[in-house]
Amino acid sequence: MKFAEHLSAHITPEWRKQYIQYEAFKDMLYSAQDQAPSVEVTDEDTVKRYFAKFEEKFFQTCEKELAKINTFYSEKLAEAQRRFATLQNELQSSLDVQKESSGVTTLRQRRKPVFHLSHEERVQHRNIKDLKLAFSEFYLSLILLQNYQNLNFTGFRKILKKHDKILETSRGADWRVIHVEVAPFYTCKKINQLISETEAVVTNELEDGDRQKAMKRLRVPPLGAAQPAPAWTTFRVGLFCGIFIVLNITLVFAAVFKLETDRTVWPLIRIYRGGFLLIEFLFLLGINTYGWRQAGVNHVLIFELNPRNNLSHQHLFEIAGFLGILWCLSLLACFFAPISIIPIYVYPLALYGFMVFFLINPTKTFYYKSRFWLLKLLFRVFTAPFHKVGFADFWLADQLNSLSVILMDLEYMICFYSFELKWDESKGLLPNDPQEPEFCHKYSYGVRAIVQCIPAWLRFIQCLRRYRDTRRAFPHLVNAGKYSTTFFTVTFAALYSTHEEQNHSDTVVFFYLWVFFCIISSCYTLIWDLKMDWGLFDKNAGENTFLREEIVYPQKAYYYCAIIEDVILRFAWTIQISITATFKPHVGNIIATVFAPLEVFRRFVWNFFRLENEHLNNCGEFRAVRDISVAPLNADDQTLLEQMMDQEDGVRNRQKNRSWKYNQSISLRRPRLASQSKARDTKVLIEDTDDEANT
């Protein structure tokens, strides 16, 4: 692998601009070589003057790059030293509290089960657990910084060697010895010391001297491109997807030849439609994950996943393929139910029962940690007013807004099984009389409207919670207003349908109100998508017309196509309303069934650019690992952090807002731990690029 490819594969994406610009240096060298005057045409002195002038410019650029790297390394090292001192303080506090409460000197001498502990002991146990996670993330940040150090030194060595080879000189090697090999980012070995001290603290204080267990906890995933999935996972993905395609073809033939024309299929379609949308969502999320990783968008950090253990795109494809097979088999079983001894109504219950069991399965199998993470996230989403809202929380709630059809179909399934299903018929899910009125359509319309509003309500109260935490009307209250338009749209749609069924004279009034609020909602959400969620139409976009100053994905056409797609699908309701008002209700149901997968696709496209925008915000803050602390932030710090996160133009301005940090000096007392021989004071000067600390 060429070094340029190696560098691109192993850099920390959030620090991309802080690495040596290796490709730019290569272009300079090759351009100088191509444009150099020929000795055959001009005299030798002219050629020498040309290369002397080029070398002066080249080494000036090298000096700027070296200064940039030194400054950034010094800042991140100072940040790491402060963080280490803070973690030691928190650890020492936990040790002191435990010694006072139990009289023991280590964390592992007390082995009572968690559910037998007192409230104070439970809090202490949770603090220790948080400390282990915090040290694990801190260790990862140290490895990233060490990797930054090594890659930049190797980059200088490679490009200066290439300089000497092209120009047939040794001045590049001399410059490296004089400048690079004495540069603070290379000579400072404090990062190695911090790594050793962190390993010692985790081993002696948190893992009771078990170094093997400590290093397993601190294990860092490969710092490079996505590692190839295990062979069996790849095999299962191919197998499941192949079977799923074959079963879908079989379903089409079965539907044509097995379904009777005198039976209505809408109950069956509405019961199985939600399962298909969920499978589509999982498959497209796998494509999202693959695309993020290829483009360098750090979704693991954005969602605050465990970098040592998370699902790859291959795993998501595998789950989607497996559930897709079950969905096809269940639907095929319904088609062939007359020749089976099992009643038709059992198959949907078995399918969705298995899906629920797969999610809540308490055994540590089938991606236990990922399923547990999702369950915790769902709990946080549905209890939004009582928790601080993070990115993953409102991202999942946004996904639910595009999957509201699943909730509506679930409500319909419960109603159908409760009131419409004829349990004594073998074809209970395929009623005989297509003209027979649908009891659930009338009985549960108010309930269906409430269910349809649930996802928007979740995002609405999340916005109110964020306003409560930050006291910033923009963007949180404005965003809440966006989701409130859904309530009006659904309400007037329900009133229109109800009054139309009863032939009320005021039906047309509710129809126009419904259309009016649909227009308001679509315009509101479209503007928010493009401007706030995606960060497009930036006035400082420069050559990226109508986009933003910095883009991650390689082709501008992706962005323009996404804008057009979002506009079309945000206003696709106009087709559905027109057809529903003109033709029979079942025609409207057909359109709704077609548009539901398209809305999932729209959210799939939205995900790419929403996470890109968040990734660029992290780049603006040079944030590469999760921020985990046992000690809670005070109100002022929390408000400041929220304001930085929500700043619309944060990618550019956050670096300006950081300037207040550079002239501070911070003195922190490191407490004495068993893994250290004596207490030390560490004074960190952030503006000092030689990284020497007074100890």
Swiss-Prot record:
List this protein's GO terms for biological process: intracellular phosphate ion homeostasis; phosphate ion transmembrane transport; response to virus
InterPro entries assigned: EXS_C, SPX_dom
Q: Which ranges of this chain reside in the Cytoplasmic compartment per its record?
A: 1-228, 297-309, 384-388, 472, 535-553, 626-695
Post-translational modification Phosphoserine, affected residues? 667
Pfam families to which the protein is assigned, alphabetical: EXS (PF03124), SPX (PF03105)
Residues at which phosphate binds: 398, 401, 482-483, 570, 602-603
Q: Which residues lie within the membrane without crossing it?
A: 366-383
In this chain, the stretch annotated as Disordered covers 671-695
Expression by tissue, per the entry, reads: Expressed in pancreatic islets.
Provide any one GO MF term from the record. phosphate transmembrane transporter activity
Q: Describe its membrane topology.
A: Multi-pass membrane protein
Site description Gating residue for phosphate transport, residues in chain: 573
Q: In UniProt terms, what function does this protein have?
A: Inorganic ion transporter that mediates phosphate ion export across plasma membrane. Plays a major role in phosphate homeostasis, preventing intracellular phosphate accumulation and possible calcium phosphate precipitation, ultimately preserving calcium signaling. Binds inositol hexakisphosphate (Ins6P) and similar inositol polyphosphates, such as 5-diphospho-inositol pentakisphosphate (5-InsP7), which are important intracellular signaling molecules involved in regulation of phosphate flux. (Microbial infection) Receptor for xenotropic and polytropic murine leukemia (X- and P-MLV) retroviruses. Confers susceptibility to X- or P-MLV infection in vitro.
Question: PANTHER family, per this entry?
Answer: SOLUTE CARRIER FAMILY 53 MEMBER 1 (PTHR10783:SF103), XENOTROPIC AND POLYTROPIC RETROVIRUS RECEPTOR 1-RELATED (PTHR10783)
Q: Which family does it belong to?
A: Belongs to the SYG1 (TC 2.A.94) family.
| Protein name per the record | Solute carrier family 53 member 1
Q: Which organism is it from?
A: Mus musculus
Q: Which gene encodes it?
A: Xpr1
